[in-house]
Every structure is written in structure tokens, then in C-alpha cells.
């Protein structure tokens, strides 16, 4: 819909100091071409909902008294194709096609995929909720599992020995890194695997 549920939840939290959450689901349904919404620049109902939530957030925050604060932030997710390349199995007898496919998958990430999109896709693969607390520090995404309290680290920007040491110091339960970030440095990759194992940290290279 147009975000009425989100508006009501934020308003109620402002009134009684609650910390309720909301989830709104909307198909990308287009607005009527002759509607006032379309004239105002809203091509889909989802766009209307997002703008309503933004305006409601500002209105509610501006109306708070005595320095009170509530969290009126929200995230927007859209269904999309994977950010990782999909392996296409060639015919067994076609060695040239197999070689081409191997070359294409040296880097498993699609070039146009953002780090944030990769992060949330990997979170879903690992069974982490989209509502988990996410922070970004020193080129590392940290995700706190709201159910177990476990810390997950995602290396999606760069990898070097100093960064590995800094991540391990935070005692995560699991670390995931993009394979391409090792840039063919097998020694660094092997040392990383050994360090993670010695520290009792699960490690995944993607």
C-alpha cells in the first residue's frame, strides 16, 4: 500500500516510547497514467510508500519534545538477480567452451554489483536476517546476528594482513571474503585460512 502501516507504527512509538518494527511489502505496481501521483512523479505505488514514510518520519521527529528521540529509519529491498556470475555447464566434449566459461568465472562477481548488494545477498545465503545490525569500519562490513549475538565480518573491499589481524581481534564467528581481493596472492590466502582455523573462526572465500 502507501505506507500507512509504517506511519502508524512510528507514530505509536513516538507516543508511548515503544520500539516496534514494521515490514511493508509492495509489488512494483504502476500508478495510473492520469493520476495525481503520476503527475507528481510517482511511477509506482512503492515510490509513493517510500516518500510517505520519509515525510512521516520527518514530521514525527520534528514533533518530538524534551529532546526525545526515536528511530524512524527504514531500509528498502528489491528482488533482483544474483550479484554473482552463474556457471553455465558446457557440453562435455566442448573443451573450448569449458575454457571460456572458466575464464569468465575467474572473478565470480558481476562488475556492476555494489558491495552493499553483495553483502545482503551473502547475509541471506548464511541465514542472517535482513534486520541484523550492520556497521562499516575500515573497509569491513560487520553484521551482528540479533538471535545469537554472533559477529560476522565481510571483506568486500580489500584484503591485506593488517586488515585480517584487525578483524580477528574482534573475535567474529565467521569471516567471508571475495576471492578476487587476494589478487592471486596464494601465500596471503593460505595464511588467512590458517589464521582463521587457529582462531576457531569459520572462513569462506566467495
Outline where the language-model segments fall.
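Walker A/P-loop
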Residues: 1-8
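Accessory, often C-terminal, charged low-complexity segments
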Residues: 11-206
Amino acid at each position: 500500500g502507501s505506507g500507512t502501516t509504517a506511519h502508524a507504527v512510528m507514530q505509536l512509538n513516538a507516543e508511548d516510547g515503544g520500539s516496534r518494527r514494521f515490514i511493508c511489502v509492495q509489488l512494483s505496481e504502476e500508478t495510473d497514467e492520469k493520476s495525481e501521483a503520476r503527475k507528481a512523479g510517482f511511477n509506482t505505488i512503492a515510490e509513493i510508500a517510500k516518500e510517505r514514510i520519509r515525510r512521516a518520519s520527518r514530521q514525527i521527529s520534528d514533533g518530538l519534545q524534551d529532546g526525545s528521540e526515536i528511530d524512524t529509519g527504514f531500509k528498502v529491498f528489491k528482488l533482483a538477480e544474483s550479484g554473482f556470475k552463474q556457471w553455465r555447464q558446457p557440453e562435455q566434449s566442448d573443451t573450448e567452451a569449458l575454457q571460456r566459461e572458466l575464464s569468465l568465472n575467474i572473478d565470480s562477481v558481476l562488475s556492476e554489483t555494489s558491495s552493499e548488494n553483495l553483502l545482503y545477498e551473502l547475509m541471506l545465503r548464511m541465514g542472517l536476517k535482513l534486520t541484523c545490525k550492520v556497521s562499516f569500519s575500515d573497509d569491513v562490513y560487520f553484521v551482528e546476528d540479533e538471535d545469537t549475538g554472533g559477529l560476522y565480518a565481510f571483506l568486500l573491499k580489500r584484503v591485506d594482513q593488517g586488515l585480517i589481524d584487525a578483524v580477528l581481534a574482534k573475535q567474529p564467528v565467521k569471516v567471508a571474503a571475495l576471492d578476487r581481493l587476494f589478487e592471486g596472492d596464494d601465500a596471503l590466502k593460505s595464511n588467512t585460512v590458517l589464521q582463521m582455523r587457529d582462531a576457531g573462526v569459520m572462513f569462506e572465500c566467495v
